[in-house]
């Protein structure tokens, strides 16, 4: 009785991305060079080198930290953390945003270089969450900064945040460099 081993795709790699890289490899093998537009090339490079910074305000920040640990390892998708807003492309707002913290959020967002993206993580960042009716809570960080991706949950899992990162990469690939 023998075992038949079939090759499995790498966990976490979307099949569309595999097909994209396979077509690039085929073109390079056939012709020895690659023909593409500058927009596609810049967007491809941008999706593989997203630098994120945290704006962790509450319990969602724990799941955000878990996403960068070895189990999920967001750096294999080209999503690496940075400590300064001047070195970051993406800001993850995780947790309850209060009225007192809103100007600081806007200041950090303004310090980020263009193009910049925002991921709103969790019910509190998306719409106020459990504290929606409190006098001191902003009912969604999209009232302060433009949000590109919303990740629902209380708190959302690390898988959900990683899926949001992949959606952001797909969005960047679709938009042109000049259009944003």
Curated annotation (Swiss-Prot):
**Cofactor comment:** Binds 1 [4Fe-4S] cluster.
Q: SUPFAM superfamilies annotated for this entry?
A: HydA/Nqo6-like
Cofactor names from the entry are: [4Fe-4S] cluster
Enumerate the catalysed reactions.
a quinone + NADH + 5 H(+)(in) = a quinol + NAD(+) + 4 H(+)(out)
Q: Which domain of life is it from?
A: Bacteria
Q: Which NCBIfam families match?
A: nuoB_fam, PRK06411.1
UniProt-recorded name of the protein: NADH-quinone oxidoreductase subunit B
